Amino acid sequence: MNIPIGAGHGLSNIEGHADFDIVWPWNRPEGQRRGATAVLRVRNEVDSMRFVLPPLLRACDEVLLVDNLSDDGTGEEATRVAAELGLGHKFVLREYPFAVARAGAEHLATNERSVHSLAYFYNWCFAQTSTRYTWKWDGDMVLTTEGEASMADLSWQVGMVDAVIRFPRHGLYIASESKAYLDLGLRNVEEWGFPMSPDFVYTKAPEWEIRTTPDEFRVFPLPQGLCVELKWLDGDEFAHWSNPESFATSLRNRRKRREWEVWNALQAGEVPERVVEIDAPPGVHVVDHVTRTWLPQAPRPFEVDDPDHAKKHLRA
């Protein structure tokens, strides 16, 4: 009989790094408190921190940022942003000093109980929280004004029930401070909000980590237009993947193939179908323009034209 991952006291890693063994939050003497924590796992996201953190800090009870071997000052910049907002008391910085396997072939070849495993890394990160609810958040995801209000409302409403929140996001490809390209040709609604309990922990899946769920739980999808995912065209967007072949064929990787298509087209000076070119007004950064003005003012219901999604009846 298989024992559920979250059933025991915690997890130990095969390398014997006792300082990075995992104790599940629900087993700690102090227990868990009501509220919600946004958990960010980041590496070299310094340019995104000033956009990502402010709405999260306002919307959540706590923001936990786990820095995984950044060498660009991401942790320092995140600390500065939180302090500048007067919300440093909501911000927690942790360091994870081990190289983590990239999604795809590297992940598949890594033992699930290794400190280098994506699943172990995610479990360690979320084990640092103290609230009953968590948001799995990326270091390049920026809430719109509507998204911030929605997350703030949900963070106190869902803390006592087994509810999973599916949060939509749209790729925003940044060409400069004044120009970006918004991909409205991909419907991407993933599960980002989870209770912190033994039923909701991470395990190994073929290309990446996946969160376990009980047989019965409630799922609440949010509407489109609440969040963008920053993709800097002068950066290395696919560094966390082993190679392009790792997402070349699987239906699960349809989103990554779309991003690869859009990224390479824009690099070649072409704007793909269903990608919208957006110019910010003078003196306003294009990320602020899109999240505070363009998306909130777009007609509702906000729709994404993704024929493949409708044709294949995909979940996300």
Predicted regions mapped to residue ranges:
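Active-site beta-to-alpha loop of glycosyltransferases that engages the nucleotide-sugar donor
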Residues: R33-A36, L40-P54, L69
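Active-site-proximal specificity loops/subdomain of glycosyltransferases
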Residues: N13-A36, G75-Y133
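A structural signal for short, well-ordered beta-strand segments and their strand-loop junctions
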Residues: L65, Y133-K136, V164-P168
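Short beta-strand-to-loop acidic/aromatic patch adjacent to the donor-nucleotide binding site
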Residues: T131-T144
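Catalytic-site signature of metal-activated, phosphate-bearing donor transferases
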Residues: M1-P29, L108-F126, M141-A316
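Residue-level detector of structured alpha->beta connecting loops
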Residues: C60-D61, S130, G159
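Short beta-strand/loop segment that forms part of the nucleotide-sugar
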Residues: D61-D72, V92-Y96
